[in-house]
């Protein structure tokens, strides 16, 4: 596996591959890779001749500097995992390489990017679109792979792909969960064993809420009240939304696809965890 740090080197390498008629898959990551990322990489390896995995902790999508500072950085271990998964290229640029000057581009796709994470983390999705659009431009992939854990992020990037006319296929891959049901996340490494056990309640109550036959408001209240009742967990938001537009719904008949998206603070630090459940 090649480890590339420069955009020009990446583009030269991929140009050669493309001239040979090879297909290219891109898996954008921020590093601190786990089994969820590995599943995306393996899918790309099976679908494409060449798989590029970007490892870049993107500062423009963090509105909280402390969150950026404590995000795990594990490049050596990440590269070992990628090699085991069969990736051909790890692209690990510096911040200066990606942003030699401040990126002043603005992306706006309401309501998809203005609710939930967009409301709680102003500027977050603008930063996501900045970096992902750059990565798409550098690699010109046939396919790009994203994990469904970040459900809203996928919806926003789909809007951006349509808006900017990228000729690629977006591939959404299922959430990979720990045995407890907790969605795998790089942030899980920041949890103590006790906090990790607490966090398993998030998906447990989401899953249970699909079986109770409640209306939308009752379902919302059931999830929030039960999670908030556990010491060490605090719901920041739980939104039941149209699975395509992410607009909030009031009735199960309001949309063909319905998803519940949640963010919960866990533990004393606290660590912010996201998850979702499909209702319809």
Model-derived regions, located:
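Nucleotidyltransferase catalytic core that binds NTPs
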Residues: 2-232, 241, 245, 277
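Phosphate/ribose-recognition catalytic cores of enzymes acting on nucleotide-derived substrates
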Residues: 222-280
């Amino acid at each position: 596996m090649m480890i590339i740090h420069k955009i020009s080197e990446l583009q030269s390498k991929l140009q050669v591959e493309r001239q040979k008629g090879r297909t290219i898959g891109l898996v954008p990551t921020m590093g601190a890779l786990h089994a969820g990322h590995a599943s995306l990489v393996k899918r790309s390896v099976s679908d494409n001749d060449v798989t590029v995995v970007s490892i870049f902790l993107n500062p423009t999508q963090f509105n909280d500097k402390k969150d950026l500072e404590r995000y795990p950085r594990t490049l050596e271990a990440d590269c070992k995992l990628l090699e085991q998964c069969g990736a051909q290229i790890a692209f690990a640029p510096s911040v200066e390489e990606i942003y030699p000057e401040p990126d002043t581009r603005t992306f706006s796709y309401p309501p998809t990017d203005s609710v939930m994470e967009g409301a709680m983390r102003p500027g977050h999705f603008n930063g996501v679109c900045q970096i992902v659009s750059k990565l798409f431009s550098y690699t010109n992939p046939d396919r790009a792979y994203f994990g469904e854990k970040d459900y809203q992020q996928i919806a926003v990037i789909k809007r951006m792909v349509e808006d900017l006319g990228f000729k690629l296929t977006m591939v959404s891959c299922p959430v990979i969960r720990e045995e407890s049901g907790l969605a795998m996340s790089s942030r899980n490494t920041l949890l103590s064993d006790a906090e990790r056990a607490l966090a398993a309640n998030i998906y447990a109550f989401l899953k249970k809420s699909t079986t109770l036959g409640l209306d939308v408001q009752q379902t919302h209240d059931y999830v929030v009240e039960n999670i908030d009742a556990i010491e060490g967990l605090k719901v920041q938001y739980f939104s039941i939304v149209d699975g395509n537009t992410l607009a909030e719904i009031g009735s199960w008949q309001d949309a063909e696809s319905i998803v519940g998206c949640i963010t919960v603070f866990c533990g004393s630090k606290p660590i912010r965890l996201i998850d979702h459940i499909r209702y319809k």
